[in-house]
A protein has these predicted regions:
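N-terminal Rossmann-like FAD-binding beta1-loop-alpha1 element of flavoenzymes
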Residues: 1-26
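Flavin-dependent oxidoreductases
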Residues: 12, 172-262, 266-276, 286, ...
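Glycine-rich FAD pyrophosphate-binding loop
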Residues: 18-40
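Dinucleotide-binding Rossmann-like beta1-alpha1 core, especially the glycine-rich loop
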Residues: 43-123, 248-249
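Short beta-strand to alpha-helix junction loop
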Residues: 53-62, 87-96, 135-154, 164, ...
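Helical element adjacent to the flavin cofactor pocket in flavoenzyme catalytic cores
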Residues: 135-193
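C-terminal catalytic lobe of FAD-dependent flavoproteins
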Residues: 151, 246, 255-256, 267-395, ...
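Iron-sulfur (Fe-S) cluster-binding segments and ferredoxin-like electron-carrier domains
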Residues: 272, 403-413, 437-455
Length: 466
């Protein structure tokens, strides 16, 4: 069994399959797990209230919300159930709120509640002037987008799934014995079953198998991360009334204690265009000025860009081809993080129907990821951790309070940090106010020593020692 794509969906599928007596390979073109679309989103665990009723996405997002809400705390994935307010800014939007609540009810979500303008401003005193009312969605939550795919991949690996990175799938050949031969940028892989969870490139992989049911058009979303001093400005996830194109620009806290503004929504052709744009950031500032005016007086910590795998269809594109022993998971947009575990369940059922024999293992090992969220104690705050290993009391990244012990643990993990980017997602090092200006030298030295690499090699530079 080969799973192409080690994003949050592919990793969730690998974790699901790891419960059975199968030989599985999780393969990705990138240098790390969750390094594509999965790392750059709004980091919200969606309740599914606004999905289109009757769609596969609606069903899997609702199921995924329940699964991930239960799995997350046990696996160490930071989740904060702070709720959301869907804010109406004019009479037309206000009139749309009852219909949105009815839509939520058709999706099985019955907790949506209309609130008047007075209650809205009591809940959010820093909200910009002119709001007319809101819909309260209590089950929208914050989640760490980095830890979720890492937890899935880690649990898959400790239960026997092989992980192969830096392996772009360039071709598919049929072998006389009925196996698929995946030609990658590193080697060839033989697999009886193949699951395509390649995200932005799912359509390209699908065409290698002879199908053309959808085309992925990258939808660029730019976001601005504000300093932690801005966090008290907002108490809920502040959502706009959605459009047909996008859920719109929101203001939301993060599990790291920042505030984020975004995303934009721009369909583009280039699947690698993750640079921010002046026009995009200007648009966000204009919208942010109306949403929470005081936010624009706060310092910006970072800007990032994510590409969502939009297609011409209004639903997930999940298809099973039993004769080929092939499954395609495409068109998984901004709800993919929430739906990931339910998508994995759905794929398992489809593979079983396609003839895959599943025998459950006697043991399925659990994992607990190191906490990088602010709602629970961090290692530098834990006397027991420091007593057991003094490195957990030695802070290296002072903006984010990341310790030497966390960095070394990330390098030694079952799915280890292999780069500074990978270390950021596992520990928060270099993600703070100074963006590594003060700590990058020490963090890089620690990572290079722990990996047994020169700094030049780690950074992809010519090795000056040779």
């Amino acid at each position: 069994m080969a799973i192409i794509g080690a994003g949050v969906v592919g990793s969730a599928i690998a974790r699901e399959l790891a419960q059975y007596r199968l030989r599985c390979l999780l393969i990705d073109a990138g240098a790390d797990v969750g390094a594509g679309t999965s790392k750059a989103n709004t980091a919200i665990l969606h309740s599914g209230f606004d999905a289109k009723p009757g769609t596969l996405e609606s069903r899997l997002v609702r199921r995924g919300h329940a699964l991930l809400s239960a799995y997350g705390p046990a696996a160490g994935i930071p989740i904060e159930p702070i709720g959301a307010l869907l804010v109406a800014w004019d009479e037309e939007q206000l009139a749309a709120l009852p219909g949105i609540a009815e839509n939520a009810a058709r999706n099985g979500y019955l907790a949506a509640q209309s609130i008047d303008v007075d209650e809205l401003y009591r809940s959010e005193p820093h909200l910009g002037a002119g709001a007319r009312g809101a819909l309260r969605i209590p089950d929208e939550s914050l989640i760490c987008p980095f830890t979720a795919p890492l937890a899935f991949a880690t649990q898959a690996v400790v239960n026997g799934v092989a992980l192969q990175l830096d392996s772009r799938v360039d071709g598919v050949q049929a072998h006389p014995d009925g196996l698929h031969v995946l030609v990658t940028s590193r080697d060839t892989v033989r697999a009886r079953y193949v699951v395509n969870a390649a995200g932005l490139y799912a359509d390209a992989i699908d065409r290698l198998f002879g199908h053309a049911g959808f085309t992925v058009t990258p939808r660029r979303g730019e976001l601005i991360v504000f300093d932690k001093l801005a966090r008290p400005l907002v108490n809920h996830i502040l959502l706009p009334v959605p459009t047909k194109l996008t859920k719109g620009v929101l203001v939301s806290p993060t599990v790291f204690g920042n505030l984020v503004l975004g995303p934009t929504a721009e369909d583009i052709a280039d699947k690698t265009a993750t640079a921010s744009t002046g026009a995009g950031l200007a648009s966000l500032y204009e919208k942010g000025r109306r949403l929470v005016p005081a936010l624009l007086e706060e310092e910006v910590t970072a800007v990032y860009v994510g590409l969502r795998a939009a297609t011409e269809h209004g639903d997930y594109q999940i298809a099973f081809h039993p004769a080929q022993r092939y499954a395609c998971i495409g068109g998984i947009r901004s709800t993919g993080l929430t739906g990931s575990m339910a998508i994995a369940e759905h794929v398992l059922d489809g593979l079983r129907d396609a003839g895959l024999v599943l025998e459950r293992k006697a043991e399925f090992r659990s994992v607990r990821m190191p906490n990088i969220g602010e709602s629970d104690a961090r290692p530098y705050q834990c006397a027991e951790s420091i007593a057991a290993d003094p490195d957990y009391g030695r802070i290296v990244c002072h903006c984010e309070r990341v310790t030497r012990g966390e960095i070394l643990a990330a390098v030694r993990a079952p799915v280890p940090a292999r780069s500074l980017d990978g270390l950021r997602r596992r520990t928060r090092a270099l993600l703070g106010r100074c963006q590594g200006f003060y700590c990058a030298g020490e963090v890089t030295r620690l990572l290079s020593e722990a990996r047994g690499q020169s700094v030049d090699t780690l950074l992809g530079l010519p090795d000056r020692t040779s």
